[in-house]
Structures are given as structure tokens and as C-alpha cells.
Amino acid sequence: MKTGSNNNHISASSSSSNNNNNSSLVQQQQQRSTTSVSVSSSHIVTEWEDGIIFDVDDPDFCNLATDKLNFIVPSAANMSIASVHGPQIADICSPLSHHNLGLSASLPDLVGSPLEISMDNVLTIEELRQHMGSCFTCGVSWTDDHVSLDCSECGGYSLERPCPLCDGQCGVQWKRDFAMSHACSQARWVGVCISYPEVVAGVQLPVGAGAGAATSCAAAAANQLRLAQELCSRLEQLSTSTASKSGRI
């Protein structure tokens, strides 16, 4: 009877040890599977997780190793040069790029741009008259009573001279023809001589130079006079508009 009880005790202990061994094996397998799953999950990145960057101060990931974290380093963004530069003057003057330029630019937008008009580069009416009253050949100012004796455009006189037909015997002072003097680069005078009224036209135009040369010189003078008058009118309009704008401000 004692032997049977011992055998039963041995068999019970062996079965319990087998159960313990089996349970330990199951636990080891579970640990291995968990480890393999965790390792595989740490290496496998799905398309949903690709590109995700976590902050360093995130409480869910603050205990991770620093070598596994992606740090965001702030850097200054470089803007393209083409996005800050305004239109160049070559693009503005080009006829192919006129359709790209709008007319909605206001006055503050034009400040500092190539379209800004500097008042230093605009001639006033007085400056234009001073320019027209100067010799284009030697540069002296006829309006200031300056003259060059060896210049054909000056002709030895500034604004007036005695009658060239009778050498001043009639007492009439002839006035300078600015347009003709500038166009022909020779002194031209306008006046009427009391002693010889029939030769006035011959003095105003060069005698003996031919009808063709006289006609071309007269046409050039008329064209220059027209341009000067047009420029004067534009300057007057510009000065009027500038004065009105300054009054509104």
C-alpha cells in the first residue's frame, strides 16, 4: 500500500512539473511572438505612417531614444529673386510684354519703380525757353546777351541787330528767328527795312543757295518749331496737373 501511494505521488508531481514546463514554454512562445511582432512593427512603416514627424516634447513619445526621433531644424526660407523684382525697364519698353502690364498701379506702387517720374529730369517752361534762346552750335545764351563772334549761328549778335540791308541806316532793329537759326545753324533775322521793303524775303531765306536748299531748311525749321510748341503745351499740361494734385493732397 505504501508503494502505491508513492507512485501516485510521483506521478502527480511529474504531471504538475510537466504542466509547469508547458506553461513556461507557452509563456516563452508568447514573449517571443510579442517581441517579434514589436520588432517587425518597429521596422515596418505603412504608407499612412510614412513621413510622420513627432515633436520632441510630445508626452506620448518623450521616453523614446533620441536617435529614433526626427528633429525639425528651423531654417530661413530663400525666396526666389524673380518673385521680388519688379518689371525691368527693358520689359516695359518691349512691345511684346505690353499685354503683361496692367494699368491698376496706384501712386504708392509707382514709388521706387522704373515708372517713377523724377521732377529733376522734367524741363520747366522757363528752362525750355532758356534752351531755345541759346546757340546750339557754341552754347552761349542769347537771352543773357551773350554772343560768339566766330559762330555762324550767332552771327555776331544775340537777340537783335541793326537792319542788315541798310546797315542800320533806317533805324529798325531786326529780331532773331530762333527756329530758322537752330535749323540752319546760321543766323536768321526777321524785320522790315524802310528803305528796301521788297527784299525782306530774300534776307529771311538764304539767297543764292538754291530753291531746294531753302525749302528743306524752311521745312526743318517748321518741324522743329512745331515740336517745340508741342513740348511747351505738354509741359504746361503737366505743370497744371501737378499743381492740381498737390492742391488736393
Curated annotation (Swiss-Prot):
Transmembrane segments: none annotated. It comes from the Eukaryota. Keywords: Coiled coil, Olfaction, Sensory transduction. Residues 218-238 form a coiled coil. Disruption phenotype: Reduced attractant response to some odorants. Expressed in the third antennal segment. GO terms for biological process: olfactory behavior; sensory perception of smell. Residues 1-40 are annotated as: Disordered. The keyword Hydrolase does not apply. Plays a role in olfaction. Belongs to the pinocchio family. This is Protein pinocchio. It comes from Drosophila melanogaster. The gene is Pino.
